[in-house]
């Protein structure tokens, strides 16, 4: 049975009040003897991600009463965290990982989840690897631009692999292009869209998607304006964007029958079923789904720090670490709170700051 089909119709909760054990059973396909429902061993359970989603999406209306609701939530949580097989530290990492992925932008959530990280450190490595791919100063501009395009296509393919309706793919592609543009750019400019040396931001490097997800077949911009996004500023001018013709989906998954327009999307999708991680570390045996992630991981063993700050000479193993460090020298604070206007150099600091606003709102609600 595929992970997708299990997710859609796999869990049968038995909430009868007089039962001594409130357990969750997994619905299996009918076996040769005609038996349909049975509990299954831990090593044959579906992906814990399925139970995590069920745990988070569970509603009070799904149970006959409060006692049954707590019992069902407890069972779903147990099937997600699996205390019978995981240590306390592993369970803690799973909870931290879930929260970390939840606070990411939607397009990055998809990217991270496709790599199936087992803890927060692996999730960070996935994102740092993406950022390095998008912003390698040692490569020609044309090659870096092409890398961004390929990665955007790859990320859109992953949305396809997870069953996103084709009508929404253009909107997702726009989100991803903005995200890749923000990750790639380190240019500073004024209100005229000029860089620090007075030159206009190159028009040919503008991303092809703008402002809204509701982009028509042809997009015309009127009077030039300044559009600021994250760390980048540039003048908006008149240009057109035409949709690509719909692509024929000719790659089929043998497990669940889903169709994909690109072979790479099918390969990524099939890892959902297989859990394949073909790239293993010879030092510690840890396996990864992508060779680029393995390269990043190996720096833990080698101590390699190829990214060096030209200001002070400090070196970093990840390009994202260098980018964050350089803000100490530049004083750059690209992360701004929309509620009060306060700016921060690190997104994590902005997140903590915004939690304070949320707490204040909650207190106001309680007082009322």
From Swiss-Prot:
Modified residues (Phosphoserine): 132, 142, 274, 292
CDD domains, A to Z: SCAN
Example of a GO cellular component annotation carried by this entry: nucleoplasm
Any GO MF annotation of the entry: RNA polymerase II cis-regulatory region sequence-specific DNA binding
UniProt PTM comment: Sumoylated.
Subcellular location: Nucleus
Region annotation (Necessary and sufficient for nuclear localization) ranges: 251-301
The SCAN box domain, residue ranges: 52-134
Keyword terms of this UniProt record: DNA-binding, Isopeptide bond, Metal-binding, Nucleus, Phosphoprotein, Repeat, Repressor, Transcription, Transcription regulation, Ubl conjugation, Zinc, Zinc-finger
Disulfide pairings: none
Keyword Repeat on entry: yes
Cross-link (Glycyl lysine isopeptide (Lys-Gly) (interchain with G-Cter in SUMO2)): 22, 27, 147, 177, 236, 277, 286, 361, 367
SMART domains: SCAN, ZnF_C2H2
Name used for this protein in its record: Zinc finger protein 24
C2H2-type zinc-finger residues: 251-273, 279-301, 307-329, 335-357
Biological process terms in GO annotation: myelination; negative regulation of DNA-templated transcription
Family membership noted in the UniProt record: Belongs to the krueppel C2H2-type zinc-finger protein family.
Chief subcellular location: nucleus
Gene3D superfamilies reported in the protein's UniProt record: Classic Zinc Finger (3.30.160.60), DNA breaking-rejoining enzymes (1.10.4020.10)
Modified residues (Phosphotyrosine): 335
